[in-house]
Amino acid sequence: MIYQERLLKILRSTHISEKTSIILERHNAFSFKVAKYATKTDIKNAINMLFSVKVNTINTMIVAGKSKRKANKIGRCSNWKKAYVVLDKGQKIDFINTVE
């Protein structure tokens, strides 16, 4: 039970950009913002549990936070982790129908 709760906290949100839409069309890969402590096996298990699809490969990367400036103060956004999840052929994640 504790492991399932941990898996639910791993996937933060989907990451949508021009690059991810091109990768989705060409390689059937989805992009997610994930927890920084998540490993590739954790991400794979979380996607299998939530969406019931078979994952082919996963590529992860740490995205550096941007520097933000407001008046004379310089702040910084925190780093975050992004995962590209490539599904097997014929597999598809339907985000609309998975939410109940």
Curated annotation (Swiss-Prot):
SUPFAM superfamilies linked to this entry: Ribosomal proteins S24e, L23 and L15e (SSF54189)
Gene Ontology process terms (BP): translation
One GO MF term attached to the UniProt entry: rRNA binding
Keywords: Ribonucleoprotein, Ribosomal protein, RNA-binding, rRNA-binding
Gene Ontology cellular component list: ribonucleoprotein complex; ribosome
InterPro entries from the UniProt entry: Nucleotide-bd_a/b_plait_sf, Ribosomal_uL23-like, Ribosomal_uL23/eL15/eS24_sf
HAMAP family reported for this sequence: Ribosomal_uL23_B (MF_01369_B)
Entry function: One of the early assembly proteins it binds 23S rRNA. One of the proteins that surrounds the polypeptide exit tunnel on the outside of the ribosome. Forms the main docking site for trigger factor binding to the ribosome.
Family: Belongs to the universal ribosomal protein uL23 family.
Subunit comment: Part of the 50S ribosomal subunit. Contacts protein L29, and trigger factor when it is bound to the ribosome.
Protein's name according to its UniProt entry: Large ribosomal subunit protein uL23
Organism whose genome encodes this protein: Blochmanniella pennsylvanica (strain BPEN)
Native organism taxonomy: Bacteria, Pseudomonadati, Pseudomonadota, Gammaproteobacteria, Enterobacterales
